[in-house]
Amino acid sequence: MKGILRGAYCVALSISIFLCGVILALSCRGITLYKKELLQNGMTVAITLFMAACIVMLCVYGKDKLQTTRRKFSVFLFLLIGLAQIAFLLLVSRPMTIADPARVQNEALAMLKYHHGQMDPTNSYMQNYGNNHFITICFYYFYKFLTDVGITKVWVPTVVLNVLAIDLGILLTFLSVKKMRGIGTANFALVLFFLCPTTYLWLTSVYTNTLSFPFIMGVLYLGLIDKPAKRWRMAVHDVLLAVVMAVGYRVRPTTIIPIIALGLYLTVRLIAGWQNRRALRASETMETENASEEQQHSRQRVLEGAVRVGLVVCVSMAVLFSSSNLVAKHVDAKKFNQQFPVVHWVMMGMNEKSKGGFNRNDRRYTSSFPTKEQKRKADIARLKQRVKKMGPVGLAKHFGNKMMRVWAMGDDDGITNAQYAYQYPPFFRYFAGKQNAWFMIYMQAFRIAMLFLMLCAMCRQFLQREAAPGAMYTLTFAGAVMFFMLWEAGKRYNICFTGVCLLLMAEGADGFTNTVFNKGDAWLKAHFNGMRLHAARLVVLAVGLFCFAGSFAAANQLSHPRTYVEIPYFNSKRGKDEEPIRWRYHKNPKVLEQTIEQGQLEWRNRWNRIRLYFWNLAPNESGDEYRIQVLALDDKEVLYDKTIAPNQVKREGYTIAIAKNKLKQRDSQIGYLIRLTHVGASDRLIPMICRFPLLDPYPYGELKVDGQYKDLGSIDENFSQEKCIT
């Protein structure tokens, strides 16, 4: 039994090591996928790997300097992280009222202001994504509380809530490392959080990606501190664990991954302890009386364990049942009958064209079937078709693309999402603007260093004979990687596992890596001294990373064309998050004026197209409907003037192509004025506006309807003339 257990443990760690190694290899060439050329001298890959080597060296050797630090230094580091987050919010970042976070928060506000606490059944997003009902209702009660205390502007409190959730996850990670390795290594983990870009990039994106972070670390920490104690203490511990597991699962279902990892770890530890006691009883030195007493204690431990497991299960089920009743109080199940089946996200995850990411065509495909059972059967059929078409080799390549998308890229899609606002803060350009090359290189270098030290930690765990507490975090990481190999591969889906990764990074620097480098140091110290010794250490690390990643980087540069980041020239809403302007704001608008300001991300002045969206198209009708004008904000020069009819508008919108010779080199705060004048007899073309008007924490341009300002988002979408590949 013990041999089987040891074999299963080694297999699990071997899979984890293999997955981490593959992601590390992909990450070493990931910097080439961001922009055509970050640095003009073409040394981007070399500089990234060299910077990663420097980070590894600082982690390995700088960690020892923190071993003598104590609690006061921990308080200082927490304050430093908090101040850095505040500085990032004020000087760099802007709110991200986009995509899923905006849909959830806007619906919560609509429930509060218009629907008397009931979810709107006409909201197609809420119809399809039932997994977000619980978090939407939580936001509803949060906004209701703010309204009751007199706070009507909810965006700042929402960001504060997000920051508190992230910092709570950091605190739980700190406590976990302190329990495993002592306060010195725990302080080193705080330094890693201070240096990690993910700590800052997603402060204004308030969604389950960040809100589930403390729940994941809470589940693992409560499992880590489990030990024999007084019965009432163990009961409190088990109830708290059950509540954290159940609520965390409702916030984001991926919380099931650390729950499974915790269960496997506790099972392995239980069986190993039972095997050790059994071997002790079988020894010739044990007296018969002691053996009988030990058997009685064993039966008592089994009974206590069964009671504790039963308590956790019962409390978890009670919390899940209560949360379901809470959702049912605000959601009429009879009206919400268009929810997607679970297999929908697996089917979408097998889409080669989107590399397993979100795909609108897949969503439309599933939505086209009336019942959930029909959706499930249709998604299964398409899933089988895609898997069969790819074959084993294509499937392996597809899994590699998904690992690259979710785990290997250092920005986790934070840079792209940070580009939606305008009137950028003073330091935005150096982090997410057109002068952010060095920050992007640093992000990728930190990701490479993190994966390298994580790999070292896993190798150290593999060499140990018994399951160490760190294995619980390794199993969580491996489970998350395998889960997103099958599931929809969102670029930001790994954010909630940042604490797990940084904990393993700290363990890698503290354990296996430190031992290896100490042995190497003995040879280096025998041949070098002073500054030469430090230079030799740096060269050894750099050469090691170059040897490991050089082939991957070279192969990528030789066999793949350069790719571009999808960057909006004018920063506004993207996608189909619009609604007809006539419905809620004006019955028959005659003149619409939309101001959009130029962003900082101009690339070689090749942006010259603007797309407008319309609703209620009538392609077979003729006659003039709208006169469209585009004026430059600086000198009011007319860059575009045309009258269009319904048959000129395609289903995906109407594209304005501004002549290149009229595009000028403009300041980052100058943009365009789009003017739509209704000249027809009836409204066959109704412009669309942003569908998140209730949030509007930071306007994406000014909208006028018949001369009156409306505090809304853009009615346009802007895109590059160049081919964009993400």
Pin down the residues of each PLM region:
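Short hydrophobic/aromatic helix or loop-helix immediately within or flanking a transmembrane segment
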Residues: 107-109, 124-151, 163-164
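Membrane-interface anchor segments at the N-terminal boundary of transmembrane helices
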Residues: 35, 39-48, 153, 157, ...
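Membrane-proximal stem/loop segments at transmembrane-domain junctions that anchor or position
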Residues: 114-119, 328-420
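Start-transfer (signal-anchor) and selected internal transmembrane alpha helices
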Residues: 1-89, 300-316
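Specific aromatic-rich, kink-prone transmembrane helix
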Residues: 172-175, 211-229, 241-245, 259-263, ...
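Transmembrane-helix motifs of polytopic, lipid-linked glycan transferases
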Residues: 160-180, 218, 452-459
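Transmembrane-helix signature of polytopic, membrane-embedded enzymes
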Residues: 168, 173-195, 468-471
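Multi-pass, polyprenyl lipid-linked donor-dependent membrane glycosyltransferases
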Residues: 157-165, 188-223, 248-261, 493-498
